[in-house]
Every structure is written in structure tokens, then in C-alpha cells.
């Protein structure tokens, strides 16, 4: 059973700074050959060309796509994990030392994976989850929003813009909703983390996001979808 560290289906890594080119790539789908990447390349104008693609099954129910492309004139790598929750895998929230608490210790995802496996869980894939910040009054680490683990609410204070939640219910189904809808079913939530802006709602763009290649810095980001 997969016990994923901080839930994610999509990991996008970008280099700092961005200077986009207006040059058009004449290759079909900007060079993408995999269907999932063709759809992304066709709908993201800031992707200029796709250089390398690889796809493989990490485990039954977990399909990985590893892509290198040019985004705003800079090399970018993106990892996509498609997880089939109808197979013998699931997604779970992790915490430092695999304990039912947050805010006490800052710990790398790799170490959290080792701690989870030491407790009997088989970890196949892990990534970072929500934001956190250091308390201004004591040496603790404050989650950016909701944290539920194994049916227990570990953190319920909502941080700045943490107005959505990704969560799994007791029946194993995954959902992304505004916090108000989450609150209506929170008694049946198994694992949950908060999130910021939604890119898509029911397959439609949720809003307009501006990329200013002269002023913005780009950082590694994690996205999740259902």
C-alpha cells in the first residue's frame, strides 16, 4: 500500500528567473509525443519546446511521466504521477517521525518516508505538501493550513489564502473542494492538506494567472488534481 508523503499527483520543477521567447515551435505539440504532455504543451503558451519524455509504471496503479522542456527560455523538468486509487495503492499525509503531531519538528520528505516505512508502511512515492512557516514567538513550525492524518485533525487553523483542501474520505475517494465544502464532510475525512489557488474546476480554467517574465522568480511547485 502506498503511503505517500504529503499528497501530490504532479511535481513541477522550474529554475529561477524567466525570460520568455516569442519564437514559435513548428513541431507538432512543440515536440511532445506522449498524449498527456501533448495536451499540456498545446495549452501552456510559455512552454516553447519539449526535449525529452519518459513514461513508466512505478507500481501497479502508479504511472510516471518524466518530462524535460523549455519554459520561458529555461530548462524545466516536470514529474507527473498518475495514481489509480482503485488499485492496491492509496495516498496519505505524512508527518515528521510519522507521529500524530505537527509544528514540533521540521523534517525532510526522505526522512519522513524512512520513518513511515519503519512503522510498517510501504512508501512508493513522496513529495512535499502544503506550505509552512516558522513561528515568530517560539521555535515551532506552523502549517499553511489544514492537516488531517489517519482521521485525526492535527491542525485546523487556516493560513493566508489556504482556502481549498485536498482530502481522502474514509471510503478512499479523493476530493478537492473549498474549505466550506470540506467542513461539511470533515467527520469522514481520513487525510487532508490545504492548498492555495485552484487552476481548474470541473475541467475549466478557474482564473487568469499572469506570468511576468521580467519580474517574477520561479520556484519548485507541487500540484495535485483529481
Where are these regions (language model features)?
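C-terminal motif of bacterial Sec signal peptides marking the signal peptidase cleavage site
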Residues: 16-19
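Glycine-rich, charged/polar anion/phosphate-binding loops
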Residues: 65-67, 162, 185, 207-211, ...
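Extended C-terminal subregions enriched in glycine
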Residues: 168, 174, 205, 209-226
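Short, conserved active-site entrance elements at the starts or edges of catalytic domains
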Residues: 187-210
Amino acid at each position: 500500500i502506498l503511503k505517500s508523503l504529503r499528497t501530490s499527483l504532479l511535481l513541477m520543477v522550474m529554475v529561477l528567473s524567466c525570460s520568455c521567447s516569442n519564437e514559435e515551435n513548428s513541431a507538432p505539440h512543440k515536440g511532445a509525443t506522449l498524449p498527456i504532455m501533448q495536451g499540456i504543451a498545446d495549452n501552456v503558451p510559455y512552454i516553447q519546446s519539449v526535449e525529452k519524455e519518459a513514461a513508466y509504471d512505478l507500481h501497479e496503479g502508479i504511472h510516471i511521466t518524466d518530462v524535460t522542456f523549455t519554459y520561458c527560455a529555461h530548462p524545466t523538468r516536470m514529474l507527473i504521477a498518475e495514481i489509480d486509487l482503485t488499485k492496491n495503492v492509496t495516498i496519505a499525509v505524512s508527518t515528521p517521525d510519522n507521529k500524530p503531531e505537527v509544528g514540533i519538528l521540521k523534517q525532510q520528505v526522505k526522512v519522513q518516508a524512512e520513518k513511515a516505512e519503519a512503522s510498517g508502511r510501504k512508501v512508493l512515492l513522496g513529495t512535499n505538501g502544503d506550505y509552512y512557516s516558522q513561528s515568530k514567538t517560539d521555535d515551532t513550525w506552523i502549517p499553511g493550513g489544514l492537516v488531517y492524518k489517519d482521521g485525526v485533525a492535527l491542525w485546523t487553523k487556516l493560513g493566508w489564502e489556504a482556502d481549498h483542501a485536498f482530502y481522502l474520505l474514509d471510503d478512499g475517494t479523493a476530493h478537492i473542494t473549498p474549505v466550506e465544502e470540506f467542513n461539511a464532510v470533515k467527520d469522514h475525512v481520513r487525510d487532508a492538506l490545504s492548498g492555495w489557488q485552484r487552476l481548474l474546476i470541473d475541467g475549466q480554467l478557474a482564473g487568469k494567472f499572469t506570468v511576468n517574465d521580467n519580474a517574477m522568480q520561479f520556484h519548485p511547485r507541487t500540484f495535485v488534481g483529481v
